[in-house]
């Protein structure tokens, strides 16, 4: 017969109890995570998922939240996209009303739709020109700032702003650069 100490008996009892407590904590946290993701996504479908699916969904959601740069760019283009969508809906409505109006001249309909298309194209060109002007203005603001003097040991790539340093040759058009 094997002799067991009080410590060994205590460990035999304590280990399963600690495991149950750990699992209970994990389940509670998973339930909290489910409700948080459901609230933030506005989707109650996650509440009916099993634990593995819910964790996968939460990871995907967190990755989407992790990219603030993309979100900021989307937020900047959101009003323009909203306007474009509204404009196109209005153009479609005009087209539908003109097509359903008895006695409407086809030539008049074509000229109205051509005009609306030209206005839309002009608005897009204006927005692109405005974006380019903003980029140029930001570049000029950064290049006019006082730069710290470079030491001979430096790499030569020092800049106090995010935009690239102006090149020595004159540029006719601003070049788009991904940084």
UniProtKB/Swiss-Prot annotation:
UniProt domain bHLH: residue ranges: 10-65
Limits of the Orange domain: 83-116
GO molecular function: DNA-binding transcription repressor activity, RNA polymerase II-specific; protein heterodimerization activity; protein homodimerization activity; RNA polymerase II cis-regulatory region sequence-specific DNA binding; sequence-specific DNA binding
First-listed, main subcellular location of the protein, grouped into a coarse class: nucleus
UniProt keyword list: Developmental protein, Differentiation, DNA-binding, Neurogenesis, Nucleus, Repressor, Transcription, Transcription regulation
Superkingdom, taxonomy of origin: Eukaryota
Compartment list: Nucleus
Comment, domains: The orange domain and the basic helix-loop-helix motif mediate repression of specific transcriptional activators, such as basic helix-loop-helix protein dimers. The C-terminal WRPW motif is a transcriptional repression domain necessary for the interaction with Groucho, a transcriptional corepressor recruited to specific target DNA by Hairy-related proteins.
Designated name of the protein: Enhancer of split m8 protein
Organism: Drosophila melanogaster (Fruit fly)
Lineage: Eukaryota, Metazoa, Ecdysozoa, Arthropoda, Hexapoda
């Amino acid at each position: 017969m094997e002799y067991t100490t009080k410590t060994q008996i205590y460990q035999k009892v304590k280990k399963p109890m600690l495991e149950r407590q750990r699992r209970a904590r994990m389940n509670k946290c998973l339930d909290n995570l489910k409700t948080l993701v459901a609230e933030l996504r506005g989707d109650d479908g996650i509440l009916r998922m099993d634990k593995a699916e819910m964790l996968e969904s939460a990871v995907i959601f967190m990755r989407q939240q992790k990219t603030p740069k993309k979100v900021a760019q989307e937020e900047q283009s959101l009003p323009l996209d909203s306007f474009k969508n509204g404009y196109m809906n209005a153009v479609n409505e005009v087209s539908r009303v003109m097509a359903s109006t008895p006695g409407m001249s086809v030539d008049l309909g074509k000229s109205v739709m051509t005009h609306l298309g030209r206005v839309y194209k002009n608005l897009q060109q204006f927005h692109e020109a405005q974006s380019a002007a903003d980029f140029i203005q930001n570049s000029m603001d950064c290049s006019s700032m006082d730069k710290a003097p470079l030491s001979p040991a430096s790499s030569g790539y020092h800049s106090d702003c995010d935009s690239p340093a102006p090149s020595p040759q004159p540029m006719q058009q601003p070049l788009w650069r991904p940084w």
